[in-house]
Amino acid sequence: STTNAAGAVYDTYLSNFRNEDGSVNWLPVCADAHGFVVNKDLFEKYDIPLPTDYESFVSACQAFDKVGVRGFTADYSYDYTCMETLQGLSASELSSVDGRKWRTIYSDPDNTKREGLDSTVWPEAFERMEQFIQDTGLSQDDLDMNYDDVVEMYKSGKLAMYFGSSAGVKMFQDQGINTTFLPFFQQNGEKWLMTTPYFQIALN
């Protein structure tokens, strides 16, 4: 339970589901991808190309704005959505040599020193977030958007893209909305999806 891998797991699982010899048996579970849920019907209606990189993503947001449709938003009333957006936009930095070094130290359960944000990885990450806010037209009003607000905008054709779970694709397809899923487009050309387990299972 003192390894980096175990340090990333909720302690209650490690403490309460042990075998008699102290070991823990784990079952792998599926991951839930997070990225951009996209209304393809709106792209086709307004003849706007689906984004393939960061530049075309920004162009799509601007094109939708011109026809009175919101290009992008998310349920930013929840702090975790803000944090996940920052992480997704910063995937390139966090996966760099410096980024991996910072993450290893930050998540090390043996590290007794409080580890804050460093001065190498995070300034660039926050600059990227600031640029993203400007490019997508996010404003103070978006901090009041909850999940229901976003879903209603999307269903009513007032929103083309939002940051969310891949589960949203199936949900909207079942409602007859032609929906697809796009990754985080990095400004360096890379494409990333965030994945998180729905839950973790320990057996004893």
Where are the language model's segments positioned?
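Hinge/lid segment of periplasmic solute-binding proteins
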Residues: 1-34, 85, 181-182
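Extracytoplasmic "Venus flytrap"/periplasmic binding protein-like
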Residues: 1-9, 16, 41-52, 152-153, ...
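Short, solvent-exposed loop/beta-turn-alpha elements that line the ligand-binding surface or hinge
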Residues: 2-9, 92-124, 186-194
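Extracytoplasmic/periplasmic substrate-recognition and gating elements
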Residues: 46, 135, 173-204
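A local structural motif
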Residues: 46-50, 130-145, 158, 175-178
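Short helix-initiation/N-cap motifs at beta->coil->alpha
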Residues: 54-58, 140-155
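Glycine-centered hinge/linker elements that transmit conformational signals in sensory
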Residues: 61-63, 104-143
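Alpha-to-beta junction loops
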Residues: 67-71, 156-164, 177
